[in-house]
Amino acid sequence: MNKLQEIDQEITYWYRERLKLLHPLRQLFWECTLRCNMACRHCGSDCKTVSNVPDMPFEDFTPVLDEVRLHQPHIKTMVFTVGGEPLVRKDIIECGRTITEKGFLWGMVSNGKLIDSYMMNELSDAGLRSLAVDVDGLRDTHNWLRNDNNSFDVVYNAIGHIKKAPHLIWDVITCVNSRNISQLEEIKRMLIEAGVTKWRCFSIVPMGRAKDDEELVLSNSQYRYLMDFIVKTRMEGKIQLSYACEGYLGDYEGLVRRSHFLCSAGLTTASVLSDGSISGCLSIRSNYHQGNIYKDDFWNVWQNRFDKYRNREWMRSGECADCKVFKYCQGNGMHLRNNDGSLMFCNYNKLFNSK
């Protein structure tokens, strides 16, 4: 790590300490449905076409929006509708329109299957400002991961409609696994030719359907290759590639994404799950819920709970007990913790302390 990286790392540490005290809510995720029109191999939520958990009525979520707007009117909070697949909700356009009318920025994460010209126009007219869609490889590897032989063609067509939308910040997400990692150069060329300017690469966490699927999890050498590929691509400057927000990456910090690692869950990010549970980010599938909107005042929960998120000293156990980089890592992302507090895996060790 060079001197500039070390300085940025210290700045990030003190910035995190400040956020622990202030915790401004900048991102609010609403799990608006657990229904999905796909059955992806890596789904962390194990979503299905018909969910055992009904969609939350939008009128149950709107009081949360009103509380947030009342208590921090000066902050432009981004509200993300996620699932499942949010576009399977018949009222999603009206939900987004109301979110926008209440003074929030509206964002969405979608598999792209239902995005055509008409849908994109409807989303834009309702105020959509941020959108992420998935392209998980070339045709064969994308369709394999998505368990759908038509998925690649559909999402590729969707990109053509998305890039025409005005005032929209959008990017493509690729979940990198052992099948598509050898295709990264080809995927990069394909995305650039399709007019994609922003690209994010994720590694797959062993949870949900991916828990026991070894093909989805990168080996240590593959993980290092991914980091080196991102560094090289960022230096080329042909497409804005970054690694996902998960995990402390040691010497790669500041090189594979715009800022150094900082798990924003409970600091600037909260989520309302489909059953009303209040949590950090929706990538957290373990039970670190802090309350429920059907029983608790959301803003009171945000202000006065979330101690496990804001004070990470409880994570100094197991492989984190004597870790020399704990000050900067803070026990890794909350989504990488099991219910018992143990760490699923360590990004830093995967990169630097493996044989």
Regions found by a protein language model. Give the residues of each.
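Conserved N-terminal glycine/acidic-rich loop preference
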Residues: 2-31, 41-42, 89-91, 95, ...
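Flexible mid-to-C-terminal extensions adjoining Fe-S/redox cofactors in radical SAM and related proteins
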Residues: 4-19, 23-24, 283-355
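A C-terminal junction/extension of Radical SAM enzymes
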Residues: 13, 181, 205-286, 326-328
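Canonical Radical SAM [4Fe-4S] cluster-binding loop centered on the CxxxCxxC motif
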Residues: 22-59
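Cys/His-rich metal-chelating microdomains
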Residues: 35, 39, 43-46, 266, ...
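Residue-level recognition of short loop/turn positions
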Residues: 39, 83, 273-275
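Radical SAM/AdoMet-radical enzyme domain recognition
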Residues: 58-81, 89-204, 215-219
